[in-house]
From Swiss-Prot:
CDD domains for the chain: CAP_GAPR1-like
Region (Interaction with CAV1): 91-98
PANTHER family: CYSTEINE-RICH SECRETORY PROTEIN-RELATED (PTHR10334)
Family matches, as SUPFAM superfamilies: PR-1-like
Membrane topology designation: Lipid-anchor
Name of the protein: Golgi-associated plant pathogenesis-related protein 1
Signal peptide per UniProt: none
InterPro entries: Allrgn_V5/Tpx1_CS, CAP_dom, CAP_sf, CRISP-related, SCP_GAPR1-like
Family: Belongs to the CRISP family.
Disulfide bonds: none
High-level lineage: Eukaryota, Metazoa, Chordata, Craniata, Vertebrata
UniProt entry keywords in alphabetical sequence: Coiled coil, Golgi apparatus, Lipoprotein, Membrane, Myristate
Lineage: superkingdom: Eukaryota
Amino acid sequence: MGKSASKQFNNEVLKAHNEYRAQHGVPPLKLCKKLNREAQQYSEALASTRILKHSPESSRGQCGENLAWASYDQTGKDVADRWYSEIKSYNFQQPGFTSGTGHFTAMVWKNTKKIGVGKASASDGSSFVVARYFPAGNIVNQGFFEENVPPPKK
């Protein structure tokens, strides 16, 4: 297995998240060393199997998780931009969880405070990225999406 997430990569992911979050008027995230470690460990596990799948919820406590895979070495901004691009499929008039918008909603979830990031390269050169969010977003209780995923400010 190859390269792991660098401080620069983690900061790129954080910066992009916080720029997008500012557009929605929600507080910035802070990098968390513990979440970075956990995300890094899981990205390395994904790279070793070359299978992209979410970790069991029981193994990540109250954390949410976004995953990304590419056949090349991804930048932090590339990953965040791809996740955020799901906004085009999100219906702010009928807020809620859908599988095609979950990366976007996790990124801008208002009540999330911390993020951890991991990146690992597989033997074939592909890269696996894991973002862990605390506390988790995408909670489907009544009114939670309306409260936590505001539309971008004009």
